[in-house]
Amino acid sequence: MSKDKALDIVLSEFLELAKVPRPSHHEERVSEYLFQWAKRHGLAVEKDNMNEIIIDKPATPGCENVPRVIFQAHMDMVCVCEEGVTYDPMNDPIKVINDDVTLTADGTSLGADDGIGVAMCLYLLQDDTLRHGPIRAIFTTNEEDGMDSVSYKHLTLP
């Protein structure tokens, strides 16, 4: 896949993610978004009681014995807005401004930390041009305010 095509996919995934409200401690909608994304792409997916998501992509033929690679990104974002801006982080999407050089948000935080990490993981999970061993993507919750959902169970490889 060309670099431009890969960047287009990452940007597209990020812009879709920006439509889903995802403040810390309220990641239910973004968790469900990622769960359904995995189902649409035919990937194995699990959701735990903290709304964390684990998506597994099998190895490409001939790479089954290559060690698993794990990618991790957090779903939540810091939700702030400029004075005078009406913004409800529980319900409002991020209004992204794309000037073809940079991405910014219209009066609110952008959510690039770690939305771009989530988008990059989604790109890697859908790219069928690369040969790879098993891939696991872990999407955690509440990183911005305590990291109390993160558990080390994800680090245990089967």
Task: Annotate the PLM regions.
Residues S2-V101:
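Acidic/His- and Gly-rich active-site-bordering loop/insert found
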Residues D4, S151-Y152:
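Intrinsically disordered, low-complexity boundary segments flanking structured domains
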Residues P21, K153-P158:
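Conserved small/polar residues in nucleotide/adenosyl-binding loops
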Residues E28, S149-V150:
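Conserved strand-to-helix beginnings and helix N-cap segments that scaffold or border functional pockets
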Residues I55, D145-M147:
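Generic structural signal for helix capping and beta-alpha/helix-loop junctions
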Residues C63-P134, F139, E144, S151:
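Active-site metal-coordination/substrate-binding segment of hydrolases
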